[in-house]
Design a protein with these regions (language model features):
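Bacterial lipoprotein signal-peptidase II cleavage site
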Residues: 18-36
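A bilobed periplasmic-binding-protein/Venus flytrap-type ligand-binding module shared by bacterial periplasmic
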Residues: 60, 126-136, 234-251, 305
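Pocket-lining segment of extracytoplasmic ligand-binding domains
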Residues: 102, 180-183, 190-285
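Secondary-structure end/capping motifs
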Residues: 248-331
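Conserved C-terminal helix/tail region of periplasmic/extracytoplasmic solute-binding proteins
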Residues: 318-375
Length: 375
């Protein structure tokens, strides 16, 4: 989840000047598929959150040897509530980071030199959920209601959707600061609650309905997707330091990293059972059932992609940038140099040359059985 990140940014910018020539991995590697003598290029990937299927493609790329095949020795660092990927990358402790696009734009707006090089999630997983028996079956119906949402930057997609439906988030609804769980919703203390399709939505479905003794189902809920409201700002993407990617050798490393990572996501699309086991082998906090649901939902955010996995859609970038400036995430309009699609396109072309399906046009999401407590 996103967290407020302004307090650390000034210090991080100082660290960047110091850490540009040091820090994680083979920071200033140049060229080839490893150094002379066959050594691999060492790089670090900083995840946005803890180990879970949200990052399955990267774990699969490592487990299946795809990074090795590209001459890379990749260290995957888990995230958490006190870890800001932008801070880690700017400080030189990782070459690659994963975060939502509006967080990247916010960091750039404060002169943080980072750039998106691959937009892995092609669509947003952010929703508001309501109970079916409430009759609140649209964003417009939330006027005058208690609406839960995570604050600290997570609220902007919802606020954009409310405004689009003529609802002022400051006066026409009661915004409730929602913890990173669904207890307020399950206890009916809010009329609507924020939920990612791949996480909190499952947390509701994994609970028992006290009226029936059975697990809740989607028939009990209205799921209002921000992507269907036209306010689905882009989420997980890969970013690097701007000065790092200017080096030609690092450009080669970035292309190889993306090729292997994309191949990992293709593996997870086409071999979900094996991919799930790879995630479980890396020790996630939540159980197998929850991870199975999450992997399926994450695949829905990636596939299909007409441009090829990881290639930024300029229109979606513009939507995210507009939401960011409308709601004060950034003060200055985002420029198109906030992302570079060169390396993602090169990785996609290399995979196509190997016969890989980089679009997933024919992929259909399987039906995943919800398990009690996500076990």
């Amino acid at each position: 989840m996103k967290r407020a990140r302004w307090l650390w940014l000034a210090a991080v910018l100082v660290l960047t000047l110091v850490g540009a020539g040091c820090g994680g991995g083979n920071e200033e590697s140049s060229g080839g598929t490893g150094t002379s003598g066959g050594a691999k290029d060492k790089v670090t990937l900083q995840l946005k959150w803890v180990t879970q299927a949200q990052f399955a493609g990267y774990y699969a790329a490592k487990a299946e040897g795809y990074y090795d095949d590209e001459g890379l020795d990749v260290d995957i660092k888990v995230g958490g509530p006190d870890i800001v990927p932008e801070q880690v990358v700017l400080g030189g402790q990782a070459e690659f980071g994963i975060d939502w696009l509006d967080n990247l734009l916010a960091t750039r707006d404060q002169n943080g030199d980072i750039v998106n090089i691959a937009q892995v999630f092609a669509r947003s997983g952010m929703t508001e959920v309501t109970w079916k028996d409430s009759g609140l079956d649209s964003i417009a119906s939330l006027k005058g209601k208690k609406v839960g949402v995570w604050l600290g930057g997570n609220e902007h997609k919802l606020f954009a959707a409310l405004n689009k439906n003529g609802i002022d988030p400051q006066s026409d609804v009661e915004v409730v600061a929602q913890p990173f769980d669904m207890n307020l919703f399950l206890n009916r203390e809010v009329d609507a609650a924020a939920a990612m399709t791949y996480n909190e939505l499952a947390q509701v479905l994994e609970q028992e309905n006290p009226d029936t003794g059975e697990l809740y189902t989607l028939d009990d809920l209205n799921v209002l997707k921000m992507s269907e409201q036209g306010t689905g700002a882009l989420e997980d993407g890969v970013f690097v330091r701007g000065d790092w990617i200017q080096d030609e050798g690092n450009q080669d490393i970035a292309t190889r990293f993306l090729k292997a990572s994309f191949k990992g996501w293709i593996f997870c699309r086409d071999n979900s059972d094996e991919c799930l086991q790879i995630v479980l082998d890396n020790g996630p906090t939540l159980g197998e059932g929850h991870q199975n649901w999450q992997l399926n939902e994450i695949n829905k955010l990636i596939w299909p992609n007409d441009l090829g996995i990881g290639v930024m859609n300029p229109d979606d970038f513009d939507t995210t940038a507009q939401i960011a400036i409308d709601y004060g995430v950034i003060k200055n309009e985002a420029s198109s140099d906030a992302y570079i699609d060169t390396y993602a396109k090169a990785a996609v072309e290399a995979l196509k040359a190997d016969g890989a399906d980089v679009n997933g046009a024919s992929w259909q999401a399987p039906t995943v059985e919800v398990t009690a407590g996500g076990e």
